[in-house]
Curated annotation (Swiss-Prot):
Gene3D superfamilies tied to this protein: 3.60.21.10
Main location: endoplasmic reticulum
Name of the protein in its database record: Uncharacterized protein C1840.07c
Signal peptide: 1-26
Organism of derivation: Schizosaccharomyces pombe (strain 972 / ATCC 24843) (Fission yeast)
Amino acid sequence: MSSLGKLLKLTLLGILLSFSCKFVFGYFNVNQLFDHEFIKVFPNFKGNVEAKIKYPTVVYAIGDIHGDFPNALDVLSAAGVVSPVFPHEWTAGNATLVQTGDVVDRGPDTRKLFRWFNDLHKQAEKHGGRVVRLLGNHEFMNAKGDWRYVHPGDKASYPEPSEENRIIDWGHSGEIGNLLLSEYNVTYKDNTTGSHFMHAGLSPEWAYREETVNELGKELLSHFMSREKIPEYLEDFWAIEGPMWYRGLAQLSEEEACEVALNVTKTLNVNRLVMGHTPQFHGIVSRCEGRILLIDTGLCSAYAGERAVLRISQNDTDSIVEAVYRGKIVKL
């Protein structure tokens, strides 16, 4: 069949599947199908596939996982981000997945999760997608030797002497330590959807310093790994109102939170602030007409909260923001 014939066949297939899946499931990401199938039909194509489709990507976000691989797999596979079948590879095409930190503590699967997300990152890149991995306060705590919430199964995953080997792993030369310093950040801004992601959140004062947050976070992490006294200029970063611990957007009254959110979104030039850190056990919470999205749903077994993934997609006029649960999708 000629290339034109293949393209016409592919286009017709996409239209039919789009309508079918929209009626059956209520949602369908035709962009991801087109991207994936176009490359299969035209493997030598050198142009920009994304330029051929109107809305090139969907953004997913998952909050605190806390050492629970089965529950993370369950909700990410339900959302269509990964395969439910071993080895649980990336299935979201050219989408972006943001994990907002706190992979570690409370559960046994820390090492498995870090390796899995690293593999997903590599797999996503092959399809034009990406996996953005952010640092939570618990990653910093483990780097500095604060192991109060470490699950016994996490320690047992290391060969003896397990504690010594775990210290090495979380240091500069360790697998996890090196990964955190080289691949992870504190904040991520998605310009396509106008969304700002991080673990805890930014106060108005820190919003003005947002461009320095990732660099300061890496500096602090490195000091913690070295067990060094942190410099005075980093103390505010680790303070209760700093970027790794701030809970104002989750815990302030509605009026106060909305005032802060309006201030911060204007400063950052974004539409919404997405964060984990403060558990919302009944599901993803939208505050202030969607300016604040709280996505830590306590999905780990230690908390037994709802399992949910945030999904942000585009239409002609706006972003479509949804909470994806197993068996249902809730528009936020």
